[in-house]
């Protein structure tokens, strides 16, 4: 009995160790940094802290969230500090590969804290520490110029091309014509997989949501659902592509719903329509009132205001103007200031008799 119980205990311990080995392996990889903790990322910290803030306030640039050192001061340090120029620390013997690495390392031996938070009194020696502090404490995601994420309304035109005046080589970054944008905030990326993960983890929803409550992770499932019990009008797409104006794929001048994410400029549309239509000249058409003709007080006020409101409008229909003039001709109160409408020739009795003889 003792041997059997011992074997049973060994089997149970072996089984437990076998079952717990994947979890131990996962913990080991997380400690070594091989596996990222999704609840400890910057996006997760922002989503956990900034529940009451609007989404457009969560993504800011480095200059808007962090106050950094002056660039001229940093350049003087690189020129005057021998440790930076030789890439070797004279205090501890640390050797670095880059100038920026040596500048960051020199702050370890000094009390310099050049980075300051713009929302509190927190200071730090390194920028990465302040970026994490702003995300964890204030719920703001700092988007740097080297990060993969991009703010939709941020204009970083200076980072589009890097041209050197001393050399003939000019490296121009080619922009992709299609990006993907989150409709719930201002996050944008060129990969749809990043946007799908962003919507799922940050906003706790799916890329495609139906008004009936159904959620879909891809467009194919949403289209199949819209062809069945629900219509395509009921679908809300939280991830939509955005196009540049020069792109042939850009659906410019196309009408879309508020959930599509593709917006057009109404002023540009109106200018295109008005430029394509002929503009009528005042006084050139007999259906329009000439501005030089006097208007007598016997003219009806409501008709007068209607004509004055229609006259300078370039999009007025001539058919409406003809109907309005015909109503004036049939009206008993006709002004005497329109010679083209009221005949001014008065026939004598003899002429009237001649006309009667001709008609007879």
UniProtKB/Swiss-Prot annotation:
ZnF start-end (C2H2-type): 87-109, 115-138, 180-203
Residue ranges, annotated region (Disordered): 19-41, 248-272
Record-level GO BP terms: negative regulation of transcription by RNA polymerase II; nematode pharynx morphogenesis
Knockout mutant characteristics: RNAi-mediated knockdown causes an increase in fat-5 gene expression in the pharynx. Pharynx unattached (Pun) phenotype.
Iron-sulfur found in the keyword field: no
InterPro entries: Znf_C2H2_sf (IPR036236), Znf_C2H2_type (IPR013087)
UniProt feature, compositional bias: Low complexity: 248-260
Keyword Repeat in record: yes
The entry's keywords: Metal-binding, Repeat, Transcription, Transcription regulation, Zinc, Zinc-finger
Expression tissues: Expressed in pharyngeal epithelium/arcade, which connects the pharynx to the mouth.
GO molecular function, one term: zinc ion binding
Function noted in UniProt: Transcription factor. Represses gene expression, probably via binding to DNA consensus sequence 5'-[AT][CT]TTCC[AC][AG]-3' in promoter regions. May play a role in pharynx morphogenesis.
Name of the featured protein: Zinc finger protein ztf-2
Organism of derivation: Caenorhabditis elegans
């Amino acid at each position: 009995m003792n041997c059997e119980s011992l074997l049973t205990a060994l089997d149970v311990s072996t089984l437990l160790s076998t079952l717990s080995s994947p979890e131990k392996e996962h913990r080991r990889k997380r400690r070594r940094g091989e596996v990222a903790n999704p609840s400890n990322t910057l996006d997760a910290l922002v989503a956990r802290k900034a529940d009451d803030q609007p989404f457009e306030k969560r993504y800011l640039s480095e200059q808007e969230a962090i106050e950094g050192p002056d660039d001229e001061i940093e350049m003087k340090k690189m020129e005057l500090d021998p440790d930076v120029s030789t890439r070797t620390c004279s205090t501890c013997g640390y050797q670095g590969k880059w100038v920026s690495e040596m500048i960051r390392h020199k702050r370890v031996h000094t009390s310099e804290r050049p980075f300051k938070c713009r929302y509190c009194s927190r200071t730090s020696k390194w920028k990465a520490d302040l970026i994490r502090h702003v995300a964890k404490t204030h719920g703001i995601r700092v988007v740097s110029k080297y990060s993969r994420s991009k703010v939709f309304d941020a204009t970083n035109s200076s980072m589009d091309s890097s041209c050197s005046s001393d050399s003939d080589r000019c490296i121009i970054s080619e922009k992709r014509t299609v990006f993907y944008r989150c409709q719930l905030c201002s996050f944008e990326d060129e990969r749809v997989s990043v946007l799908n993960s962003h919507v799922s983890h940050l906003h706790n929803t799916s890329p495609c949501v139906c008004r009936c409550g159904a959620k879909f992770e891809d467009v194919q499932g949403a289209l199949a659902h819209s062809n069945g019990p629900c219509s395509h009008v009921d679908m809300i797409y939280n991830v939509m592509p955005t196009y540049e104006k020069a792109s042939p794929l850009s659906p410019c001048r196309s009408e879309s719903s508020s959930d599509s994410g593709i917006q057009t400029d109404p002023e540009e549309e109106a200018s295109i329509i008005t430029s394509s239509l002929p503009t009528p000249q005042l006084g050139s058409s007999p259906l329009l009132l000439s501005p030089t003709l006097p208007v007598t007080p016997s003219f009806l006020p409501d008709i007068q205001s209607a004509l004055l409101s229609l006259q300078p409008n370039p999009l007025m229909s001539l058919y409406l103007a003809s109907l309005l003039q015909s109503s004036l001709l049939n009206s008993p109160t006709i002004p005497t200031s329109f010679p083209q409408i009221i005949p001014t020739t008065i026939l004598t009795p003899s002429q009237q008799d001649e006309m009667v003889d001709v008609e007879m």
